[in-house]
Amino acid sequence: MTSSSKPARKTSKSKSKASKAAEAPAAPSNELSREAPTFQNKVIDKKALRSLVAWSYKHHGTAATSALADDLKDLGFRFATQAAVSISVDDLRVPGDKSTLLQEAEDQITATEERYRLGEITEVERHTKVIDTWTETNERLVQSVRRNFDENDPLNSVWMMANSGARGNMSQVRQLVGMRGLMANPQGEIIDLPIRTNFREGLTVTEYVISSYGARKGLVDTALRTADSGYLTRRLVDVAQDVIVREDDCGTTRSIKVAADDNGKYKSRLVGRLLAEDVVDGAGEVIATRNTEVDPPLSARIEAAGIAQVQVRSPLTCEAARSVCRKCYGWALAHNELVDLGEAVGIIAAQSIGEPGTQLTMRTFHTGGVSTAETGVVRSVVEGSVEFSAKAKVRPHRTPHGVEAQLAETDFSLTVKPSGKGKTQKLDVTAGSILFVNAGGSVPNDTILAQISSGSAVKKSVEKATKDVVCDLAGQVRYEDVIQPKEVPDRQGNITLKAQRLGRLWVFSGDVYNLPPNAMPVVQGGANVKTGEVLAESRQVSEFGGAVRLRESQGDSREVEIVTSSLTLKDCKLVATTTHSGQIWHLESKDNTRYRLNTEPGTKIANGEVIAELADDRFRTQTGGLVKFAPGLAIKKARSAKNGFEVSKGGTLLWIPQETHEINKDISLLMIEDGQWIEAGTEVVKDIFSQTAGIVTVTQKNDILREIIVRSGQLHLVSDSKVLARYTDGGGKMVNPGEEIAPGLKAEAMHMVEAVDTPEGGALLLRPVEEYAIPNEAHMPELGSVKQANGPSMGLKAVQRLAFKDGELVKSVEGVELLRTQLLLETFDTTPQMTVDVESAQDKRAKTIQRLQLTILETHLVRRDTLSDASHGSTHTEVKVADGDNIKRGDVVATVQILCKDDGVAQLPDRKDDEPIRRLIVERPSDTITVDLGGSKLSLKAGQRVVEGDDLGGGLTCPHSGQVEEVKGSSLTLRVGRPYMVSPDSILHVRDGDLVLRGDTLAQLVFERAKTGDIVQGLPRIEELLEARRPRESAVLCRKAGTIKVEQPEGEDNPTVSVNEGEELHTEYPILLGRTVMVSDGQEVKAGDLLTDGPINPHELLEVIFEDLRGPLPTMDAANQAIGRLQTALVQEVQNVYKSQGVTIDDKHLEVIVRQMTSKVRIEDAGDTTLLPGELIELRQVDQVNQAMAITGGAPAEFTPVLLGITKASLNTDSFISAASFQETTRVLTEAAIEGKSDWLRGLKENVIIGRLIPAGTGFSGFDEQLKAEALPHPDILGEENAGYRRATNLRPDYTVEMPLPQSNTAVLDDPSDTELEATRSRHGIEDRTNLAAFARPAAGEELAEEHVPDPGALEGLQEEGLLSQDS
């Protein structure tokens, strides 16, 4: 079918929707060409099948295609049955050259390990090289598997299955017959030990365990990611659910550019789009006109004409309000026809992006690691000399594998001139390529010349990682001078050492001894020592001195205790009584005072703890009651409520008893009444009896009895209200003996008098008062103490404590103890954590009597002798004191000696400012090597460092790495050492001269590794993009166009980058540590270009581009262009993630979503409009408002475009019902209520929630009429001539309530019929010309805002007329 007839056909089709509906659903009959199939004689795989079915569908319709598909299925089954295709173990053919490939890899890795051992490369470079070697071997093995099957067994079942696309892919076949390859550990790091076998050969135990890491990870990932993916889909649906195709053509002139790839191919990116401009070929001939649908044949013609880019219409640039028009959307991919009106394209887009999320996740880890596929390695074809062209600029560069090479800074050409016959080899080198040859150098044939960069700076997303360098031998650390360690303080003031340059750390072998704390070396540095000699000695000395007690040894240590001070209670016996709950200890003094012990012998107590309490019943009451202090009695505010209040001055305590029962039962159980006098033993509530006689007070709440109080005393009925009044205030009065209480009533003893109500009338209750005398000083037993001259001292203190304060009411039935006398321990001049031991000691005179003794002990743990181990050497321990000795302060209790294991020379480490020596080293004879020089003269001096394999001269190679100790005659003594390469910025954990043991960490290498483009990156990356998250360490973006200047200041790690913007304008950009600069000196850059590597912050990109365009262009155009650039970048980024996983999604789906994310702007300054600063509003609306302002001459609103993540965009939709059903329901609804929002039910979700027909698909036609109705003005407004309308000030400009000037006789109607109007006019006597207020209906294109506040007057009028119910 020719393309010229195509546009005409399509437009006629879109005009008559009715005729289209009547036609066959697959495709209208006039489109089926019934073209006969061409004969095809080839193997048909999945791809060919797909195109066959598509061809059939296009040319022969649905019915024929389904019949064809059925026949194909039958054919497949029939022949599969006859061929008996099944998979057996024998079908897994391992390629023969596997062993050769593995051997090559092994050799490469051995060489790398050797380079590492000689300190030529760092640990990181070794690791990278190993992993890259295995990755490459794996790839080569896959090729070999392919070749093997293709050439030797093309009909192999496994090969057919994987190759036809039926099931499985090469990555799985590789694991069956190649090698399983590299695996990751649970932290996601690659283990550099690959699985060399495949499933056919079987795995070793180690390989099996390693591979099970990955398998577990796969299962867990799948489970977690399914949820993630589902949530992503839900957010996408929510943001795009109201995008429906609502019109045929929005008529926009804006478009997006689709560019061909490097090979001039468009693949499927043009198919299904409509052209925005005519496509003209080189000869000026029009290939296709605007609005032509691009089908595959037309796409092929455009490619053939060599057109590099085409402008097409896209949902991104569609100007339809809140929807997409058919022409901008293009084909609906379900049936490759122009999309229908009413199609819910938003939801289709959301599902298309969300659904592959689950597939994404399930692709578990394949190879990971740094892939070298982005760069092409070029080898020399001839032997010859290398020349660079004149404009070549290179700088030294170290590759990730530790190879010294050069990095090209400009584009130039490299030639290899052959030394003999042959053609000159010419090579175009792009900036960023790595060169492995030097200009003027000669190269043999088949040598790697360069790694050519793909030109554009490959944006790798990198992350910082660290790797520890672990020491392989014990010895002393020495730096090479090149490292130049620098002290870097961090925020906390800790200082770390960092290497500034690439260099080596050496460890020179020796026997290192760890010294215990406080051990002092006994030998001098440089002294010769013999096996068994003492190297260091540590002494344990007594801090205070005292009597020594040697305890029995436990395990491998003995305890030496020294009693520094003790305290004995001389006049008290220690008595134990056994009860069923254990032993209770008492102290009994000569005058029969008894103290109950709170601790027991064998325990420890601290300062201020109670040792014993006086057993004393004198202060025990019968019942609860009220506490009153008589004047004179004083207490301290004691710290602990548990122990009560300490008495500071003795005196009298008054106690008024009363019995309180706490009940909490139903009121029906009460057996007495409130105010009644009862006798002792009366049952007050079922099963509860009173202990004393007295007046009852009942407290109840909600028919529940709370408490019953019984107040004992004498009751006197009194009728005089004045007398009663005297005793009602303040809960009664104290009366002394002999005082008159009432006429004719005298107090016999001290009483508390209260007025009470009884069933018989008013009365006075005389309550008895008990007095307790409290002494000034508590009783204190006699003490005897022993104390060292400067040891800690201690004593006992007797304290009286009152349990209650003045005026406190004690609610209780049983009695309470009012006063307790306690013995407290007091220790002085001691550390807070010091404890005192409680012991029972025999009386020196009477052996049968036990006394309580408190002692302060100093304890020393003395270890047994140990035989030598790897780091400590042998130790010998001696205890220098005997049991019962009395020693002085500073006397030695025990010594520990460290003995030498081998003969050698002892050396002490370099010391800094008297820091203690924690290690020492013995250089043994085995740590040096003597090399016989055989008479050759060497230029080596003592102290020089050599590496194994170095040429010593005279045909001698160095047998071992190390340092030259001395050159004597014909022999050379070498101290064995091991070099470790450290890279710049590494953190050094050891200083020059430190002693290290095997397994210690020497340094931490800081390096950047490419994040594995693995799916664990996949979903979170897509989420990051769609949620528009700000990346942690984003790239530095250029803010204004100009020329780059890169400088490297002396002594600084980081280069400085500045952009010369012309006219003396320079902008300097700070480059953070560890950032790679992506631009070179003299390069031209535009606003928004990357200056350093790292992820782009989309918000910053939008802001930068908008600010740059805002000057030369009007704000609206600047916003449109900035949004456009951001949109393409976003679509591209998301596509990259999916493509890297082999998932194809049509661009238009992403465009629909991205359009929703970028549709809003933030108002900066409202100008004369009614918008609010900071408000988020659609760009379209602001444009309309600003156009209106331009007509009226008002100041327009200033705004900046914003990018909203999908969650934010969903919560910021016009429909509050949709937003509330998504997240934060309460907040959304509350805000909507406060703002008085209206929901116009435009999307699908709102309508589903309300329960209406959705405005898509078949429900679209009704919606269509509603749109048309909304577009027309109100009938009343049409008949209006009078200009008496004013705009309501509190409303948004896009929805107006027209209000008449105030008038006395006004009726207000909304949408009335003519007869109603007539009736109203006649009823109110209104003339025809009177103003009528009406709500103006907005036009279809206008925005209907949320806050529509109806005029209260209008509502009242409607209610009066009965056109609106009163309650609505």
Swiss-Prot record:
Which coenzyme or cofactor does it need? Zn(2+)
A single Gene Ontology CC annotation of this entry is: DNA-directed RNA polymerase complex
Per the record, where are the segments of Basic residues compositional bias?
A: 7-18
Please tell me where Zn(2+) binds in this chain: C250, C318, C325, C328
A Pfam family (short name) is RNA_pol_Rpb1_3
Q: Quickly give the catalysed reaction.
A: RNA(n) + a ribonucleoside 5'-triphosphate = RNA(n+1) + diphosphate
MF annotations from Gene Ontology: DNA binding; DNA-directed RNA polymerase activity; zinc ion binding
Instruction: Give the enzyme's EC designation.
Output: 2.7.7.6
GO annotation terms (biological process): DNA-templated transcription
Cofactor: record remark = Binds 1 Zn(2+) ion per subunit.
Q: Where is the composition biased (Low complexity)?
A: 19-29, 1353-1368
Keyword Transcription appears in the UniProt entry: yes
Q: Which PANTHER family match?
A: DNA-DIRECTED RNA POLYMERASE, DNA-DIRECTED RNA POLYMERASE SUBUNIT BETA
Describe its assembly.
Answer: In cyanobacteria the RNAP catalytic core is composed of 2 alpha, 1 beta, 1 beta', 1 gamma and 1 omega subunit. When a sigma factor is associated with the core the holoenzyme is formed, which can initiate transcription.
Family to which this protein belongs:
Belongs to the RNA polymerase beta' chain family. RpoC2 subfamily.
Name this protein carries in UniProt = DNA-directed RNA polymerase subunit beta'
**Protein's organism:** Synechococcus sp. (strain RCC307)
Q: Which gene encodes it?
A: rpoC2
